[in-house]
Amino acid sequence: MSVRASSRLGLLAVAMLFAAAGARAQVPPPPTYPDKPPEGLKPNTNEDEPLSTEPKPGEVIQKRPGKGSEPLQFRPPPANPYQLPGPTRGAPREAPPVPDRWRIMQALGFKFPVYDPYNQNVLKGDLPLWNDPWLKEHLPWVAEKLKPDWFFSLTAISDSLVELRRLPTPVAPQTSVRPNSVDIFGQGKQQVFVETLIFEMAAIKGNTTFRPPDYEIRITPAIQYNRAEVDENRALRIDPRQGTERSDNHVGLQTAFVDVHLRNVSDRYDFDSIRVGIQPITSDFRGFLLNDVPMGIRYFGIRDNNHVQFNVGWFRKMEKDTNSGLNDPWTKMRKDETYLANYYQQDFPFVGFTSQGLAALNINREGTQGNYFNNNGFIERPAALGDERGRNYTVGYLGYTGDGHLRNFPGGFLDRWNLSTSVYIALGHEDHNSLAGQSQDIRAGFAAAEFSRDFSWMRLRLSALYQSGDKDPYDHKATGFDAIFENPLFAGADTSFWIRQSVPLIGGGGIALSARNGVLASLRTSKEQGQSNFVNPGLMLLGVGLDADVMPQLRLIGNFNYLRFQDTTVLGVLRNQKPPDREIGWDVSGAVQYRPFMNQNVVFNTSAAALYPGKGLKQLYDEDKRGPQYSILFNLLLTY
C-alpha cells in the first residue's frame, strides 16, 4: 500500500471518530423528575408508615364506637401525574347535550309514570312544571308563566290510629250506665279510632339544590274522622243522654303561608326571608315552650355559612277543633298573641354543640270574651275552678337551650356523650286568678336535660326535668311554670303514658293533671283550648331510655320514668282535702317501629305504656282497687 493510500485511510478513521463523538453528544439526557410534585398533588409519602391514632386539636374522628369500624391504618398511595395520560387534541365529546339538568334521565330514554314516588316525578318537585307535556298541551299559557324554575310538590299522608286505654273516669252525676254505681270513680276503659288524611301542596320557585327558594307557597289541609267509646255516661259529652259513643269529623288547615326570599347577604347564600300565614313554629329543640301551627309573621335568616340562625316573629293562636286537635279556620282566632325572638349559634361554646338564646312574650286577653264552651259542651275558658271568673295575663319567657355532641367538652371525659338541654324562667302578671280570687305576679322556672350515648346500634338516654310548683295559692305569687303550647319530644314523647294521655283531676274541677301530648303538670282544661295556668303543683321527672336499631327496618324503644309533684298544696285546695303525697308513680313504656321498605313511605308503630301509681296518685284516684292506668296503640303511616 502506498503512503498516499495509508494517509487517506487515516483521515477517514479520524473523521468517523469525530462523527461518532458528535452523535453521542446530541443524544438527549434521560428525563429527571422533580423531588416535589406540582402544586395541588399529594406529596410523596411512606406507604409503610402507620398513621397516627392521636387526633389533631379540634379534629372530629369519623368513627363509630365499638369494634369492626377501625379507621385507615396506612396512607393510600400518592397520585403520580406521570402515570395518567393527558387529553388528546380533537377527542370527541363523550357527554351528549341535554335540554336542562332536570331532563337528563329522559334524554337517556328513561320514562317514569307520574304516580311513581321512587323516581323522578313532577309531583315530587323533581322536574320543573313548565316543560311537563300535559301542561304544555292543555294549558300552554300557564306553562309559559311558570318558566323557567317553578316546581310543585305534593305529599299525601294517611295516619291511622287504634288506641286502647284506661283512665280515671267519673260516674255521671245525673245517671249511670250500670246500677249501684254510687262511687266517684267509674269504669275507665276507652277505645279510640282515628283516621287522618293530610295533603301538603307546595309551589316553589328557584334552584333549591344549592340556594334557598325565591318564593314558596304551601297549603296543608287535613281531614280527620274519629270515634270514641267509653264505659261511663257524660265522659264524652256534657249531655248524659248522648251515651257512651261519639263519632266526629273535621276539616282543618294546618299550614297556609307565603315565603318570600328577600336577599342574599353573602356568596355562600346566607339569606333573609319573611313568611306570612299559618305556619309551624318550634321555639326550641325539644318543643317545651311553643310547638304549634299558629297564624303569624316570621322574619328569619342565616349568617356565617349557616353557623348563625335567627327568628323574629309575631304569632296568634288559631282556635282548635275539640276532638281532633286540628286548626279550625272557620272560627275567629283567639286573643292570645306571642312575640318571639331566638338566636342559634353553631359550635358554641365548643365544636359540635349548638346554643340558642330565646325571648318570648305571651299576651292573653281572653278574660273579657266571656265563657267559651268546647264542641262537647264542657267549659274551656275560664277553667271550672275557684270563682270561675275570666282572667287576662302577660308573661315573658327568657331561655337558653343547647343540643349537640360533648366530644370537645373541656377535660375530654364526655367525648362519647350527647346533650340536649333547656332552661326557662317565666316573669309576668295575671289580673285575676280563679283559685286565689286575686291578682298574681308570675315567677316560675323550668329546666330539662337529656344525656345520651351511642353504643354501636343502641342509644342510651338519661332524662331529668324540673317544673317549679306553687306552694301557696293565696300569697299573690304564681310560681308554677306553664308553657305557651308545649309538644315535647322528651323522655319517650308520645309513647310515654304521662305525656300522651290527659289525666283528669276528678273532683277538683274540669281540669287535667297534665295535658294530652304534654309533660307539665299545669292543671289546664286542655292544652289546645285552655289558658296557661301558673298555680300548679309542678313536676320532677327522672328517666332512663334505650333506642335500639335492631335492623334498618326495625327499631325498639323503651322508657322508664319516675314522676313526682313538687308541691301538692294546690291539689289539696282543689280537692278540699289534706294535700296528697308528692309521689305520682312509675311510667313504663315500650314501642316498636317497623319500616318494611327502609324508608318513611310505610311505617308501622305500636306501643304500650302503663303508669304504676305511687302514694300520691293512689290518694287522688283510689288506684288500689283498679290497677294501673295503661295505654296501648297501633299506628300505620302511609306517605306519598
PLM regions: where:
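Bacterial N-terminal signal peptides
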Residues: 10-20
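N-terminal periplasmic/intermembrane-space "pro-region" immediately following the signal or transit peptide
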Residues: 25-214, 220, 456, 460, ...
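Short loop/turn motifs that connect adjacent beta-strands in outer-membrane beta-barrel proteins
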Residues: 123-154, 165-169, 204-217, 262-272, ...
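Membrane-embedded beta-strand positions of outer-membrane beta-barrel proteins
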Residues: 154-160, 217-221, 274-276, 310-312, ...
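Outer membrane beta-barrel
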Residues: 196, 200-321, 345, 451-501, ...
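Signature for the C-terminal beta-barrel architecture of outer-membrane proteins
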Residues: 268-270, 279-478, 540-542, 550, ...
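C-terminal structural cap/anchor segments
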Residues: 464-467, 471-583
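Outer-membrane beta-barrel "beta-signal"
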Residues: 590, 626-640
